[in-house]
Amino acid sequence: MKNWKKMAILACLSLSVGVLHAGTTTSTTSTTKKSYSIDFDSSKYTVKTLTINGVTINYRAYEQIVYVKNPIDTKYETMNFFVPEAYFKGESVNGYNNYDAPIFFPNQVGGYMPAEAGSPGTSRDGVNPNAIFVALSKGYVVASPGARGRVTKNANGLYTGKAPAAIVDLKAAVRYLHYNDKVMPGSANRIVSNGTSAGGALSSLLGASGNNKDYDKYLKEIGAANASDAVLVVSAYCPITNLENADMAYEWLFNGINEYKSLKITQSTDFKVERTYVTGSMTEDQIKASNELKAMFPKYLNSLKLKDKKGNVLSLDSDGNGNFKDFVKSYIIASAQKAMDK
């Protein structure tokens, strides 16, 4: 990756890290000992039609597919698989067909919370179509996996979703697609992994760690298919990956802004993830911590020896000023201008 791209990612990290400070409640789910087949059953589907904003999609839905033999939690270790109905009539969509269509692989993870498999519908605004709907309308096959998260517990109170559970689950879902590639629509050699924030981080990790042996032990434990877990493309929005340094970056960027509006992520009694906003003012101790974290960031940033597209070294002085700050500012201004021009 070029250095200027690293800069863009770093800026995204500092903007997105606030999500990780959200309060949470734990969910308790039962551990299952039932063994499942990981052979794709093409007979279990429903043909569905959905219209949003005047666009209609007809698709075949294979839902709640358990993608491992020995799941820890079948509420999350499942996948929904959607295929444009046109492919079963020998037709093409957007130049793709039943055999070569890319597989859009969007996870629903946010805040490293557990996530159920997604479905086509409206986005959070309740008006516009979500990414799964759009992908199907463009001829993509969609495989939306669920995954365990940091608050998931079994009936005995044991946490079953702590790291590396989420990435292991997503890898297992990818392996399912490769394992069944000959009998499933779409091409497992053209998987496009997608996610936002923590989901973006997991998507990035999928792309960077394809077929890495470090995960074999965990994949074997849950009965993942003996197949590749590599993806072709990663689509990651504000991926929060650099966790050990993200707080410093965040406070460097927002230090001095002491009124806040933060996102609180909780889980209701029916296990649905709920997101609400909380407003307030920072305490004296919080302001002190912010100042200390901001002061730590320049040393870390300078140690990276990052460069812009012209080869200029980007750095900060002890006060947090310098051409790196100007570099980040230019991206923020350009982004704001683009939004204003729409």
Where are these predicted regions, by residue range?
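Primarily recognizes the serine-hydrolase "nucleophile elbow" in alpha/beta-hydrolase
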Residues: 179-256
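Bacterial N-terminal signal peptides
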Residues: 10-18
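Catalytic-loop region of hydrolases
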Residues: 24-97
